[in-house]
C-alpha cells in the first residue's frame, strides 16, 4: 500500500473517531432531501428522522445496479419485489422487505465488491440500517427470510435486465435455479417502472404491509 493511500486511510479512521465522539449539534452535518408533508427538507446524519414520503422519492429515483441494467430499474421497485416474495414465497414479514434497502434513500446503491474496499461506507450504512430498524420496529438484523427473498429478487432481475443475464453472479445459497423457475413458470418479473410510478407503488406497499 502506498504512503498516500495509507495516509488517506489514516485520515478516514481519525475522522470517523472524531465523528463518534463529536460534540457537534444535530444541525451538523446534514444533507438535503425531498421535503415531506411538513416541509422538512434536511436529513441530519447523526440524528436521522425517517420520513416515508421522502424515502420513497429518493429510492424511486435511485437506480439499482448503479444504472448498468438494460433499463432504468429503481431501488423502490426492487424493495416491493422483495416484500412480495416474502409474502408469497419465502415467508417472514414483508414490511422488512419494503424497508430492507431504505438506507439507499440516503446512500447510493454500491456494489458488494466495492463495499469490501470501503469500510467507512459499510460502517455508515450499518448505522443507517440500525436506525431504520429501530424506528420502524424491525428485527435487529436482516432475517434469513428477507435475505433469501433479496437473493431471489437479484436473480429474477438479472435474468431480465442485466448483461450476461446474471450468469456470472455468485450463488452462495443455491437460489439461482429457484429464482429462474419462479420467473419462467410462475410469472415473477419486473416492470422497470418510471420513477413516479415506482414511488407510488412503494408508498402503497409501505402502507399495506405496515398494517397487515
Residue ranges of predicted features:
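Metal-dependent phosphohydrolase cores
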Residues: 2-212
Amino acid at each position: 500500500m502506498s504512503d498516500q493511500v495509507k495516509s488517506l486511510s489514516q485520515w478516514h479512521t481519525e475522522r470517523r473517531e472524531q465523528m463518534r465522539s463529536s460534540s457537534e449539534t444535530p444541525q451538523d452535518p446534514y444533507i438535503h432531501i425531498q421535503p415531506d408533508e411538513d416541509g422538512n427538507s434536511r436529513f441530519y446524519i447523526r440524528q436521522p428522522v425517517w420520513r416515508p414520503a421522502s424515502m420513497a422519492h429518493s429510492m424511486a429515483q435511485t437506480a439499482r445496479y448503479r444504472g448498468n441494467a438494460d433499463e432504468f430499474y429503481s431501488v423502490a421497485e426492487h424493495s416491493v419485489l422483495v416484500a412480495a416474495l416474502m409474502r408469497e414465497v419465502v415467508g417472514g414479514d414483508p414490511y422488512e422487505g419494503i424497508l430492507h434497502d431504505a438506507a439507499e434513500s440516503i446512500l447510493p446503491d454500491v456494489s458488494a465488491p466495492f463495499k469490501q474496499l470501503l469500510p467507512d461506507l459499510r460502517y455508515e450504512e450499518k448505522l443507517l440500517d440500525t436506525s431504520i430498524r429501530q424506528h420502524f420496529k424491525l428485527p435487529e438484523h436482516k432475517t434469513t427470510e428477507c435475505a433469501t427473498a433479496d437473493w431471489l429478487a437479484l436473480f429474477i432481475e438479472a435474468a431480465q435486465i442485466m448483461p450476461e443475464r446474471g450468469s456470472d453472479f455468485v450463488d452462495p445459497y443455491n437460489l439461482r435455479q429457484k429464482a429462474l423457475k419462479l420467473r419462467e413458470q410462475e410469472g415473477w418479473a419486473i416492470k422497470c417502472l418510471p420513477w413516479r410510478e415506482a414511488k407510488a407503488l412503494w408508498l402503497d406497499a409501505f402502507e399495506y404491509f405496515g398494517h397487515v
